[in-house]
């Protein structure tokens, strides 16, 4: 059985990357991974390093996308961000943790974006 979650997530990350660039963000890295976890998009914007989690869905049958960013997921993102900050020596920077929710239209190429700055 084919798992559609990965291509849907990748498509959502692509949409999110374009959205952030259109808002003036400079993409530093995508899908940063370490033992602690993964961060979908890391960007810089207005003297902030922004760590962005992307959640993409076709509908709300499993709740709104940001509800899947649980306390456990937040801890993993924070620990991964700490590691990124450490290895890149970014100690003097300001930081933001954002969430982008994307709802795709199953029948067309339309989608809606909800950008939640300083989500946690």
UniProtKB/Swiss-Prot annotation:
Any one Pfam family match given in the protein's UniProt record, by short name: UPF0102
InterPro entries registered for this protein in UniProt: Restrct_endonuc-II-like, tRNA_endonuc-like_dom_sf, UPF0102_YraN-like
Organism domain of life: Bacteria
Gene Ontology MF annotations: nucleic acid binding
Family assignment from sequence similarity: Belongs to the UPF0102 family.
PANTHER family reported in the protein's UniProt record: UPF0102 PROTEIN YRAN
Protein's recorded name: UPF0102 protein NT01CX_2205
């Amino acid at each position: 059985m084919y798992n559609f979650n990965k291509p849907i997530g990748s498509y959502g990350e692509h949409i999110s990357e374009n959205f952030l660039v259109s808002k003036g963000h400079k993409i530093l890295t995508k899908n940063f991974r370490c033992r602690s976890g993964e961060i979908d998009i890391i960007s810089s914007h207005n003297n902030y390093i922004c760590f962005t989690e992307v959640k993409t869905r076709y509908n709300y049958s499993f709740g709104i996308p940001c509800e899947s960013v649980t306390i456990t997921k937040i801890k993993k993102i924070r620990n991964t961000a700490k590691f990124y900050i450490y290895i890149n020596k970014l100690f003097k920077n300001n930081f933001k943790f954002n969430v982008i929710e994307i709802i795709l239209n199953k029948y067309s190429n339309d989608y809606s974006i909800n950008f939640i700055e300083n989500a946690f």
